[in-house]
Amino acid sequence: ITVTGINDDPVAQNDVGVILEDSTLTVANSANANVSGSYDATGEHSGDVIDTSSSSHTDSDPDDSATLTVTQIKKDGGSNSAVSSGSSYNSSGTSVTGTYGTLTIGADGSYSYAADQSAADDLDKDDQVTDVFTYTLSDGTETTTANITITVIGINDTPTAVNDTDSVTEDERVTKTAVQDDVLNDDSDVDDSAVLTVSNISHTNGNSGTVSSSTTHLT
């Protein structure tokens, strides 16, 4: 009995990554992103969508001599873009812009995802959204596809305070409160549900009057 080999289809596994809204996720160290979706203190993972090591979360091909490459990439609902042969994420990689950031991937399976903070700024702290990309894996003859899902986690953004001015006649008094007199009206916070409050008031006496303050009032 002579058994003649055929070209078997490659097997692509879905990959995941988790990132903070102001960070960059680089996956390029031959160890796929943690399938549980955990992340380190900087909001980063390292790894590669192509990894033929002992990891259970890898792309593979039953054919011993098959060389796997990424040939196409697209965002969810988008059209495929070709990935240049011999490329890596940081050398001739192909970039695709998703909803919350841009993914750059190479033929070797390495990729980098840079969050677009302007797109994710309205996320409150610990809010989560996802960007999904589909890559095509080839062994030179057959192809298959899998997803890269990036979870973007919101952070608490710094509020923006705007200087306020007022005037008073020489024999009168003016008192301002944060809500009543709109001290906060021109201040802002990009986080959707942020509630702005005045936590401290300090003052300096001028040459023409005196100033007194509490945590809520300025007179």
Task: Give, region by region, the residue ranges found by the protein language model.
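Acidic, turn/loop-rich segments in luminal/extracellular domains of secretory-pathway
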Residues: 1-5, 84-154, 206-219
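Extracellular ectodomain surface segments
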Residues: 8-96, 160-213
